[in-house]
């Protein structure tokens, strides 16, 4: 192994040759590829910060006027401004009994125990039917396999929220419970491709229809591109 590593320009200390496979591989790859900060360095160099890019992003996805206090707070990425969160994805909770909402905080600071308004995709200032009041039961910094619990998350960050998913179908806009200005939503997500597969299903046992419908609703909430429709055919 020493000969092979030296041919690659990798030189280890004598004690490192006695390491187990996993830590030994880590040491070898660290010398071969260099420090693991390359991706982070690339992000810092080329990806604009939330504060620098907020104004451009708001103009693309926000449906409300841009001369309001809410819009100005979002464009400044103000952690002290009115709360506005764009929920873009739902993930199964750890017990698989419901969903947690993943979104970006554009303004304000969301805190656990806070009561918020959840605005659905069909909400408008003239028709507030698609709006519910929900209490944030948990807040996490979501890191794929890991969820880091936090008391609050300020503007400019992504957050995973528990306890607010019941009325969310695909995406939603979260705003604080009370504010002096009208609330507007973010545009629903748009995808460049449409679904290419259509499947008709029915339960083998008609009495299990409610279970199947509940499963379809969960699929509809889990996958943004999926569309489910229920048709009752009388025979």
Regions found by a protein language model. Give the residues of each.
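Structural and coupling elements of P-loop NTPases
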Residues: 1-235
């Amino acid at each position: 192994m020493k000969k092979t590593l030296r041919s690659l320009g990798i030189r280890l200390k004598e004690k490192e040759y006695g390491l187990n496979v996993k830590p030994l591989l880590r040491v070898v790859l660290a010398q071969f590829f260099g420090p693991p900060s390359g991706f982070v360095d690339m992000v810092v160099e080329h990806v604009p910060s939330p504060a620098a890019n907020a104004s451009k992003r708001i103009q693309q996805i926000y449906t409300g006027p841009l001369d309001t206090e809410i819009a100005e707070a979002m464009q400044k990425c103000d952690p002290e401004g009115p709360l506005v969160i764009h929920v873009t994805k739902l993930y199964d909770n750890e017990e698989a009994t419901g969903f947690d909402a993943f979104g970006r905080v554009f303004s304000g600071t969301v805190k656990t125990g806070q009561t918020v308004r959840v605005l659905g995709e069909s909400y408008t200032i003239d028709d507030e039917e698609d709006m519910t009041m929900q209490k944030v039961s948990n807040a996490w910094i979501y890191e794929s396999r890991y969820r880091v619990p936090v008391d609050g998350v300020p503007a400019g960050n992504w957050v995973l929220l528990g306890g607010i998913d019941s009325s969310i179908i695909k995406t939603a806009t979260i705003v604080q419970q009370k504010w002096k200005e009208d609330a507007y939503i973010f545009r629903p997500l748009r995808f460049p491709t449409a679904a290419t597969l259509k499947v008709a299903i029915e339960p083998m046992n008609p009495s299990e229809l409610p279970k199947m419908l509940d499963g379809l609703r969960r699929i509809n909430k889990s996958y943004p591109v999926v569309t489910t429709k229920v048709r009752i055919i009388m025979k």
